[in-house]
Amino acid sequence: MPEGPEIRRAADNLEAAIKGKPLTDVWFAFPQLKTYQSQLIGQHVTHVETRGKALLTHFSNDLTLYSHNQLYGVWRVVDTSEEPQTTRVLRVKLQTADKTILLYSASDIEMLRPEQLTTHPFLQRVGPDVLDPNLTPEVVKERLLSPRFRNRQFAGLLLDQAFLAGLGNYLRVEILWQVGLTGNHKAKDLNAAQLDALAHALLEIPRFSYATRGQVDENKHHGALFRFKVFHRDGELCERCGGIIEKTTLSSRPFYWCPGCQH
């Protein structure tokens, strides 16, 4: 499943295609959304916001389209004259004079009014987004030490969107390798230096991935570009200590780590 950096890249692509352009055609597959089709004609997308793995497409009439791709949903950008060839099921079409964005296969789609943005179950539950430029290491440190999270092992905590939105499995293993910790550690057991390093890594690594990577299968090293240190590298040598990277399962997900320098 795509993680925060990939979701934000997708949002950037959608914005670049249709932001600020009048909508000439709008179509929704779900009957409960049909009434909004005519309300959106002539309106425009003001911005596309990410909340972890959910997208919020904001319109100029104050409506907001909530969508969560889950495992199978995918957005596509096409020329308006193009007829995409795909076996996927179309759920949403937002068309402008030159570009159209299409959402396929997703099932978690709703239209929200402004007051619903603060009461929607997922949006209420999700924590601060790691790609939010206003989120600071100090706030992350406070969350790590809060009664709600301080006793939880990082193996599960770093996958919990209620802690920080936008983290996922590859970010989990890369962050823990960066700070030399294991999935079994808990925030309450860290010293001040470890806690500070973790709080910074929880923001810096996702933001670096977003800025320089964007696709899960891009694992090339060009200068300072993001590359995996341990993810999918079991059996290889750790570049930090020379140990052998191992693979196990933690919180029902593959976990990659170096026993030589993560302890």
Curated annotation (Swiss-Prot):
Zn finger region (FPG-type): 229-263
Xref: Gene3D superfamilies: 1.10.8.50, MutM-like, N-terminal
Entry's Gene Ontology molecular function annotations: class I DNA-(apurinic or apyrimidinic site) endonuclease activity; damaged DNA binding; oxidized pyrimidine nucleobase lesion DNA N-glycosylase activity; zinc ion binding
Recorded catalytic activity of this chain's protein: 2'-deoxyribonucleotide-(2'-deoxyribose 5'-phosphate)-2'-deoxyribonucleotide-DNA = a 3'-end 2'-deoxyribonucleotide-(2,3-dehydro-2,3-deoxyribose 5'-phosphate)-DNA + a 5'-end 5'-phospho-2'-deoxyribonucleoside-DNA + H(+)
Keyword Membrane: no
Record keywords, A-Z: DNA damage, DNA repair, DNA-binding, Glycosidase, Hydrolase, Lyase, Metal-binding, Multifunctional enzyme, Zinc, Zinc-finger
Active site, renumbered: P2, E3, K53, R253
Named cofactor requirement(s): Zn(2+)
GO biological process: base-excision repair
Sections of the chain in a coiled coil: none
InterPro entries: DNA_glyclase/AP_lyase_DNA-bd (IPR015886), DNA_glyclase_Znf_dom_DNA_BS (IPR015887), EcNei-like_N (IPR044091), Endonuclease-VIII (IPR023713), FPG_cat (IPR012319), MutM-like_N-ter (IPR035937), Ribosomal_uS13-like_H2TH (IPR010979), Znf_DNA_glyclase/AP_lyase (IPR000214)
Binding-site positions, DNA: Q70, R125, N169
CDD domains given in the database record: EcNei-like_N
Function: Involved in base excision repair of DNA damaged by oxidation or by mutagenic agents. Acts as a DNA glycosylase that recognizes and removes damaged bases. Has a preference for oxidized pyrimidines, such as thymine glycol, 5,6-dihydrouracil and 5,6-dihydrothymine. Has AP (apurinic/apyrimidinic) lyase activity and introduces nicks in the DNA strand. Cleaves the DNA backbone by beta-delta elimination to generate a single-strand break at the site of the removed base with both 3'- and 5'-phosphates.
Protein family (similarity comment): Belongs to the FPG family.
Protein name stated in the entry: Endonuclease 8
Organism: Escherichia coli (strain 55989 / EAEC)
Lineage summary: Bacteria, Pseudomonadati, Pseudomonadota, Gammaproteobacteria, Enterobacterales
Name of the encoding gene: nei
